[in-house]
Amino acid sequence: MKSSTNMGNWSQKNIYSMTIKVINEEFSICKLKDYAQIDIREPFVFTGSTDEEKSLVCPTRLVPSELLERSDGWKAFRIEGVLDFSLIGILAKISVILAENGIGIFVVSTFNTDYILTQTDRFEEALRLLSNAGYGVQYANSR
């Protein structure tokens, strides 16, 4: 999550007027033994390696056959544009709106932006709640 102690020129209104873009994929979150079967050239493949585990978030169609655990049934959207590291509260605002309505999230951050995943059965509700809060919702072209 990008954070800082200074919001710069951004106001509360700017945070709520941001656009989120729906990613037209079903996602899975996996725990792996290794990354041997992962093709990182594919879009929307996120890996994380710690001293305790190796994780993968990717389109369900790309889940490797050899894995330790998996959670299917996720949909994702991203915050459109490149987020400056000095901006704070962007992810917090989204997570509060969804948490107040009982919608859990899984977040992946990249250098440019944040990707927010929710369970598929709550995804449209999440988009509606964010739209009602002033976020623009942009749908991606179909694959």
Please report, for each region that a protein language model flagged, where it lies by residue.
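Regulatory modules associated with amino-acid/nitrogen control
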Residues: 1-99, 125-143
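A generic structural motif
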Residues: 53-58, 113-119
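A cross-kingdom feature marking solvent-exposed beta-strand/loop segments within repeated
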Residues: 101-116, 122, 140-143
